[in-house]
Amino acid sequence: MAANTPHDPSSPGHVPVMRQRMVELVGIGVTAGSAPAQPIIVDGTLGAGGHTEAFLEAYPNAIVIGLDRDPNALAEARARLERFGQRFFSYQTRFDGIGEALEHFSEDPDFPVDIREQGISGFLFDLGVSSMQLDQEDRGFAYRVDAPLDMRMDPSSRLTAAEILNTYEHGELARILKRYGDEKFAGKIASAVIREREKQPFENSARLVDLLYATIPAAARRTGGHPAKRTFQALRIEVNAELESLELVIPAAFSWLRVDGAGVFMSYQSLEDKIVKQQLKGMTESSTPPGLPVELPGTEPEFELLTRGAEKASEQEIAENSRSAPVRVRAARRIGAHASGAGGPRYPLVSTH
C-alpha cells in the first residue's frame, strides 16, 4: 500500500484480531444482570475501529468510547463509525489517558449517561502497533520498506527513532535494544550505530536495515525472523513509551470498571504479556497473609480471571490473518468493590443485583 493511499479498513490486513472472542469477553459486563440500560465500553486502542464496530453491532444498547493517540486513526474511525451516531465517542490520548478521557465525557453535557455514577462495563486494549500504522509506509514502522525513521504513533510527539539512533549514548542504546527487543547483539549493534552516525546521521530505515544485516552474524540471521525485527520493535517501544503506558493503564482502567464489568488486554510480545500477567495476578489474589487458615475480612480479591493462562488465536484465524499469530489475550472481571480510598476503586461501583 502506498504511503499516501487512503487506508481501507475492510482489507484483509485490517481484520480485527480475535473479533468474536473480544465481543464475548468485553460483553460479559454488558450482558450481566447488573448492567445499566446503556452500558459503556472503552476501546483504549481504537485504530481503524474494527473492534469498536463489532461491539456496537453486537450490543445495540451500548455506548463505545474510542481512544487513540494517532489523529489519522481517529479521523478514519470516526468516518467508519459515523452511522452509529451518539453511540460512539472518540478522544485523542495515549491509552494511559483513559482517566482524562472519562473525566472529559463526565463533564460533557451531550454525553448520554453519567460515567461517574455508572462506571464502565467493559474495556479492550489491543496493544502494539496497529495494522493501519504498519501499512502507512511513511510512518517508519515497517522494516521491509525504506521510510523516514519516525515510528511516532502520535505525530505531534517529539521523540523519533532517528533521534534515538543519533543521540543516545552507547549504554542507553544497548539497554533499550536488549530490554525492549531481546536483541542478543545489542552491544554490537549499538557500537555500529555510533560508528556510522559519526559519518552521517541516520534518517531512513533502509540504512539501519543494511547496518543490521552487516552487524548480526550470518548464522543468527538465519533464525528468529527478519534481523531487523527486534531492533525496530525496541525503537518503537522507546519512541512511544509503550511499556510505561501499559503499567499505568492497567490499574487506571480497572478502577473505572463497575461490578461484573470485564477488562481485556491483547499483547503481541513477551514484555507486554508479562506486565499484564503480573498485574492481573496481583489483582485476582487474596491479600490475606499466607499461612492463615481463613481469609481475613477486606482481603478478598476484587477481580477474577476470565482466561486460563493466555488465550491465542485459532489455527484457522492465523492462516487467514497472519498478524493474529503472536497475540496473547488475558482478561479479568470485577467481582466486588470496597470503599473508595487509597488502593480502592475510584468510585463506589456496586452491583445492582
From Swiss-Prot:
GO terms for molecular function: rRNA (cytosine-N4-)-methyltransferase activity. It is found in: Cytoplasm. One of its GO terms (cellular component) is cytoplasm. It catalyses: cytidine(1402) in 16S rRNA + S-adenosyl-L-methionine = N(4)-methylcytidine(1402) in 16S rRNA + S-adenosyl-L-homocysteine + H(+). Keywords: Cytoplasm, Methyltransferase, rRNA processing, S-adenosyl-L-methionine, Transferase. S-adenosyl-L-methionine binds at residues 49-51, 68, 95, 126, 133. The keyword rRNA processing applies. InterPro entries: RsmH, SAM-dep_MeTrfase_MraW_recog, SAM-dependent_MTases_sf. One of its GO terms (biological process) is rRNA base methylation. Pfam families: Methyltransf_5 (PF01795). It is an enzyme of class 2 (transferase). Its main location: cytoplasm. Its EC number is 2.1.1.199. Specifically methylates the N4 position of cytidine in position 1402 (C1402) of 16S rRNA. Belongs to the methyltransferase superfamily. RsmH family. This is Ribosomal RNA small subunit methyltransferase H. The gene is rsmH.
